[in-house]
């Protein structure tokens, strides 16, 4: 099956405080976006990637990904993440009309191992309509009331943190976005809303989401 990947990277990432769009923040000399796209490439399973970038940063993003030019298309993203995914999906279907599997990947998860990408693709190819990589929750989880007082301790044995890339049969993702509203942060959640089944594969600790300056410092320390 032909596999395409979408990277919605039009956000500004103000929490990172780097003065540039989060996707272009460098870690050890290479941007988060470049590392994320390279991981998709190195999986050996993705035919093409479409990046949705800030409209005024498209030339900069194209320059950043110049070494992967034949593998990547860059399109202007939208005001919301859902807009960017829709725009990237339309471009992916234009560029690779026979695509049957689509991945949606966060540039902020720049260190996701290629093996995780392969596992997600394999699960979709084997029949799962939607797949997410997950890790067990390590922290104790408390449920609180409106005043902030603890109501109960949640059984964490069935809880998982979700990573990316999330994988989908392309028609399933298309249907989910056709039914979606304007704002959503989790693509698999949209599949859940239309009654679709979402399966899991093991994630990886290296696929942490880089959101704050502290996260960035951790990533730099790991690479040092």
Swiss-Prot record:
Gene Ontology molecular function: 2-C-methyl-D-erythritol 4-phosphate cytidylyltransferase activity
Positions bearing the site annotation: Positions MEP for the nucleophilic attack: 156, 209
Domain of life of the organism encoding this protein: Bacteria
PROSITE patterns linked: ISPD
UniProt keyword Transferase present: yes
Reactions listed under catalytic activity: 2-C-methyl-D-erythritol 4-phosphate + CTP + H(+) = 4-CDP-2-C-methyl-D-erythritol + diphosphate
Site note Transition state stabilizer, residues: 15, 22
InterPro entries noted in UniProt: IspD, IspD/TarI, IspD/TarI_cytidylyltransf_bact, ISPD_synthase_CS, Nucleotide-diphossugar_trans
Record-listed E.C. numbers: 2.7.7.60
GO terms (BP aspect): isopentenyl diphosphate biosynthetic process, methylerythritol 4-phosphate pathway
Keywords: Isoprene biosynthesis, Nucleotidyltransferase, Transferase
SUPFAM superfamilies xref list: Nucleotide-diphospho-sugar transferases (SSF53448)
Pathway in which the depicted protein is active: Isoprenoid biosynthesis; isopentenyl diphosphate biosynthesis via DXP pathway; isopentenyl diphosphate from 1-deoxy-D-xylulose 5-phosphate: step 2/6
Function: Catalyzes the formation of 4-diphosphocytidyl-2-C-methyl-D-erythritol from CTP and 2-C-methyl-D-erythritol 4-phosphate (MEP).
Family membership noted in the UniProt record: Belongs to the IspD/TarI cytidylyltransferase family. IspD subfamily.
Protein's UniProt name: 2-C-methyl-D-erythritol 4-phosphate cytidylyltransferase
Organism per entry: Saccharopolyspora erythraea (strain ATCC 11635 / DSM 40517 / JCM 4748 / NBRC 13426 / NCIMB 8594 / NRRL 2338)
